[in-house]
């Protein structure tokens, strides 16, 4: 009679044996950062209802922000498995900081990398990847949630650019953000993304 297979509750999908050496190294680095740098500060942050922007700079120094962004723009140039492993290790400690990290790395940096001009990539991505700047993603609206088709925020073409008019809510990172990727409909009703900076009005 064959022996029963043994269930590994710490790795039920046997993920570890499927990872490359680089992916394991990234996971271990993220795990160490989360345990050593993030965990000791999370309880104090909860107690005092504060977010520590310095954690973003430390994430950037460790290479955890913009993991999939090309190296020439300050990212780590890693694959999405590595990005998922980073997110998983941060999530183990704190869902809030993982959400903030994901907004920065995915919802802010990826649109700039995929659709931004070369000048925008050069200007924004390195500072976002380093954590020097914090970004947010403005889609959700008070009356329509996150349904882009129903959004009422408008972008009106004016001399020198666009004027945005509308309201957004529940925007992760917005209280401490330096860069904003905001979505609005133009005069033709097409949905467009705009990169804004703190202080622009």
Specify the residue positions occupied by each region the protein language model found.
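Hydrophobic, small-residue-rich alpha-helical packing segments that form membrane-like cores
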Residues: 146-147, 162
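A structural motif shared across PLP-dependent enzymes of the aminotransferase-like
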Residues: 27, 50-54, 75-83
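Internal helix-loop-helix
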Residues: 61-132, 172-179
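A short core secondary-structure module
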Residues: 152, 161, 165-201
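Intrinsic disorder at enzyme termini
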Residues: 1-22
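C-terminal helix-coil-helix/basic helical segment that borders enzyme active sites and/or dimer interfaces
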Residues: 38-50
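Mature N-terminal segment immediately following signal peptide/propeptide cleavage
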Residues: 17-38
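A short, Trp-centered hydrophobic/proline-enriched beta-strand micro-motif
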Residues: 131-139
